[in-house]
Amino acid sequence: VPSPAISEKMEEFGKRVEDYSARTRAGRIAGYSASIFGNVVLLIFLSFFHQYIAWYHIEPDGSVTRLSMLTSDYFAWLPILVTALVISVAANIIMIIYDRYWFREIIQIILTVIGVVVVANLVSIFPFDFSVIPNATAVDITPIAVTIFLIIVAVGLGVGALVRFIKLIVSLVKQSPS
């Protein structure tokens, strides 16, 4: 029989663990909710307001001219993005309902791989027309900079998916009875 001091410490430790679990679960739910909100905002903006991705020029008479930076190829990429965003929203809703470590990690890996596919397709299709920028140097540099940035994002996402996968495997190996 543990002494009263040890028993109190064990009970206090148990409460701290429960508090921590409750906070982290609440934090994850907040994160899932923020992800859902952000994905819905992106879905709406990039589906219905893409024409505002443009170069704006103020004319001498005070009027504003909007020159689109997107080509018609944007509409070849848009279904890929919309599909990914809808999958992400659905996955985050599912993770709010069912929140287990292994499940969460698998879903995050899948979503990250989907992100790599979306970014890789964006680089491949490259639906941008930077010729509307009035600076010749910027017109030459911007496509290169955007391509490099998107490749870095895709590689970063890929590394993130690989790290999550390795952590998941290590966690599962530690839990399996030997």
What does each model-found stretch correspond to?
Residues 1-37:
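N-terminal juxtamembrane cytosolic/stromal segments of multi-pass membrane proteins
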Residues 2, 159-178:
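Cytosolic juxtamembrane helix at the C-terminal end of the final transmembrane segment
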Residues 34-50, 86, 115-118:
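Canonical alpha-helical transmembrane segments of integral membrane proteins
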Residues 44-63, 120-133:
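Membrane-helix interface motif
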Residues 59-82:
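Transmembrane alpha-helix entry/boundary detector in multi-pass membrane proteins
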Residues 88-119:
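Loop-to-transmembrane helix junctions at the membrane interface
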Residues 132-147:
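Short, membrane-exposed interhelical loops at transmembrane-helix boundaries
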Residues 147-164:
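Alpha-helical membrane-embedded segments
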